[in-house]
């Protein structure tokens, strides 16, 4: 998982990020092909909602709709937890992710200015998206 995270993310989570997220009781969903991990997501349950914290697909498996498979699995899990919606934030510059989220029914619900750290001590906006279940 860490290898995919490092290869797929511009600002990857560390082992500590994953450990903290899982210790807090968050959900980890993995997409496997045999013994090979193709992608994963981490989501946080909430009161009648869920929040996508991280999603990555191995670079060699990107462009095959696997993010959509993971997002549909997330929606099923969230419904099972009693959620009415799923929230996420994505970097404004991450057009590929934003397209994938829109294809899966997410709609922009807001903007968080300067939410993410960026290059050269700059900050990057986050697009807040919501999927009603």
Task: Give residue spans per PLM region.
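Conserved active-site tyrosine of GNAT-family acetyltransferases
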Residues: 101, 106, 129
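Short glycine/proline-centered loop/turn elements that form peptide/ligand docking sites
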Residues: 71, 94-97, 114-120
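Conserved GNAT acetyl-CoA-binding A-motif
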Residues: 78-89, 100
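Acetyl-CoA-dependent GNAT
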Residues: 2-64, 68-81, 114, 130-133
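Terminal substrate-recognition subdomain of acyl/acetyltransferases
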Residues: 121-133
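Short amphipathic helical patch at the helix-1/turn junction of helix-turn-helix
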Residues: 57, 91-92
